C-alpha cells in the first residue's frame, strides 16, 4: 500500500460526498496501491455504506466530535507511508495520488505539501466575495513550486504551507503530530468554524525537521455551496479562523503579535468597529469580525 486517503465527514451532503468518491474512483494510480478511509465523525444518522466501485474504501466511526479527533483516528487506522487528507467536498484531480507519490520521491524532505484548490460554486459568487475566497480553502500560488525549508526554527508561518484540503503528509511527519502533546487548539467541530488543526500539523512537522511545500501539479476542485457565500457565514468563518490561527501561532512560538489582557479585548473590538467602518457593508463587517477573532486569539 503506497497511499492512504483519509476523508473526515460529519453529516456530509450526500451529493457532494458522492462527487468526492467519484473523484477517487477516477484515480490513475492502480487501486492496489492505495486505500481510502472514510471517518464518520459522529454523523446523525451514521453514514450509510457507499455504492459499489471502491473496493479499497473502509468506513470507521469516531464518536468524539471534532476534525482533530477524526484525523487522529484515521491516521492510526491507515498503513501507507504517504497520506492524503481530503474533505467530503473535495474532488481530487484524476492524477492526484500519482502526482503525490511522484512529488514525494522528488522532494524527500517535504513532510507536508499541497497544491491548487479551485472552486466550483453552486451559485455564481458576488464580486465582493472574492476578497474572502481564501477563507473557503481556495488557493492558487502560481505555476511554480514553493518550498519552505525547515533548516532553522521558523519565525513565521510558512506561506507555502498546505491547506487541509488535499494536504499530503509523510507518515513520519504525521507521527510527529500524533506523538506531540495535545495543544488544545480549536478545530472544526460540528457547526464551529475554527480551523487551527491544519496549522498545528504543519508547524509540528516543520519543528520536527520536515520541509513544507506547494506544488502546482496537485489540483482539486472544492465544491462550494451557496450558503458559504452568505455574509453571515463568512463573518462567522473569518472570526473563527482568525482566532484559531493566532492561537496556533502562539502555541508554536511564532506569533508576531503580543498577547493582550483579556479586559482590553472588548474595548479594542469596539474601536475596530469604527476603524473598519463595520456598518458600511457586508465586506466591512466580515473584515471587522476577523479583527475581533484575532483579538480574542491574543487574549491571555
Residue ranges and their predicted role:
Residues 22-33:
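Short, acidic, metal-binding catalytic loop of nucleotide-sugar glycosyltransferases
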Residues 23, 40-48, 90:
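A conserved acidic beta->alpha catalytic loop
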Residues 62-78:
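Glycine-rich, basic loop-to-helix element that forms the pyrophosphate-binding segment
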Residues 83:
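Short aromatic/hydrophobic "clamp" motif used to bind/position activated sugar donors
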Residues 95-129:
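Conserved donor NDP-sugar-binding/catalytic core segment of glycosyltransferases
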Residues 133-159:
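Short, flexible, basic/aromatic active-site loop/helix in glycosyltransferases
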Residues 164, 184-201:
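Acidic donor-binding loop at a coil-to-helix junction in glycosyltransferase catalytic cores
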Residues 236-243, 253-300:
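Non-catalytic, C-terminal membrane-associated alpha-helical segments of glycosyltransferases
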Amino acid at each position: 500500500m503506497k497511499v492512504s486517503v483519509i476523508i473526515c465527514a460529519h453529516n456530509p451532503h450526500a451529493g457532494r460526498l458522492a462527487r468526492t468518491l467519484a473523484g477517487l474512483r477516477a484515480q490513475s494510480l492502480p487501486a492496489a496501491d492505495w486505500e481510502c478511509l472514510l471517518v464518520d465523525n459522529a454523523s446523525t444518522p451514521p453514514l450509510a455504506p457507499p455504492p459499489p466501485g471502491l473496493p479499497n474504501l473502509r468506513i470507521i466511526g469516531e464518536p468524539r466530535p471534532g476534525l482533530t479527533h477524526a484525523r487522529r483516528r484515521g491516521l492510526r487506522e491507515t498503513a501507507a507511508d504517504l497520506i492524503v487528507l481530503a474533505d467530503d467536498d473535495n474532488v481530487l484531480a484524476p492524477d492526484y495520488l500519482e502526482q503525490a507519490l511522484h512529488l514525494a520521491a522528488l522532494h524527500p524532505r517535504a513532510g507536508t505539501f499541497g497544491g491548487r484548490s479551485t472552486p466550483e460554486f453552486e451559485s455564481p459568487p458576488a464580486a465582493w466575495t472574492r476578497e474572502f475566497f481564501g477563507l473557503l480553502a481556495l488557493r492558487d500560488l502560481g505555476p511554480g513550486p514553493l518550498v519552505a525549508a525547515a533548516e532553522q526554527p521558523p519565525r513565521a508561518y510558512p506561506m507555502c504551507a498546505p491547506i487541509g484540503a488535499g494536504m499530503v503528509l509523510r507518515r513520519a511527519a504525521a507521527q510527529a503530530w500524533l506523538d506531540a502533546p495535545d495543544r488544545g487548539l480549536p478545530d472544526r467541530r460540528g457547526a464551529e468554524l475554527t480551523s487551527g488543526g491544519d496549522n498545528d500539523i504543519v508547524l509540528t512537522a516543520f519543528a520536527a525537521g520536515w520541509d513544507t511545500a506547494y506544488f502546482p501539479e496537485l489540483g482539486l476542485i472544492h465544491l462550494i455551496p451557496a450558503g458559504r457565500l452568505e455574509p453571515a457565514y463568512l463573518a462567522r468563518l473569518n472570526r473563527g479562523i482568525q482566532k484559531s490561527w493566532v492561537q496556533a501561532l502562539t502555541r508554536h512560538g511564532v506569533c508576531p503579535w503580543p498577547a493582550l489582557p483579556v479586559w482590553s479585548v472588548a474595548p479594542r473590538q469596539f474601536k475596530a468597529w469604527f476603524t473598519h467602518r463595520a456598518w458600511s457593508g457586508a465586506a466591512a463587517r466580515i473584515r471587522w469580525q476577523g479583527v475581533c477573532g484575532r483579538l480574542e486569539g491574543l487574549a491571555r
